[in-house]
Amino acid sequence: ANAQTTDALGTYTPYSLFGLGDIDKQGTSFNRGMGGIGIGVRDNRHINYLNPASITERDTLSFMLDFGINQKNFYNTDGNVESGYNTANMQDLIFTVPIYRKSAFIVGVTPFSNIGYKFRESETRTDIISKYGNISYEKYGTGSISQLFLGAAMNVTPNLAVGAQMIYY
């Protein structure tokens, strides 16, 4: 049997049934495009929430906004059964604003993990089918954990910036 579906699942994998779910890769699309690097990047054109001190490297007269969308295609096979899902999620919403000279404030929300699974099985025992009719069992789960963060940073010297960030899950 083949199926291709789009649903409101943040992810589609049977492994998300366990624990916190499918842990998201952290960082903006810029960080992901660089292989997930975050600590060593300090750039005036991109927001890097993985390194709070990096937000001081920006124009002191303007704010910055980053909004990302993530789309995935999942294809699962198990013996003769194949299924596919398409998912699209918000990846991040981050805002930075200058405070004073080379200091800045950052606030944002990003996903931490996603849960999304859907299992369906039909009853095959003839005694149960003859007594109750066709029966289909379904397990469905969805959810996510997001992280909200606030941070601030300032330049101590021209080559040294200090930043701190608080994260709420």
Protein language model annotation of sequence segments:
Residues 4-169:
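Subset of outer-membrane beta-barrel
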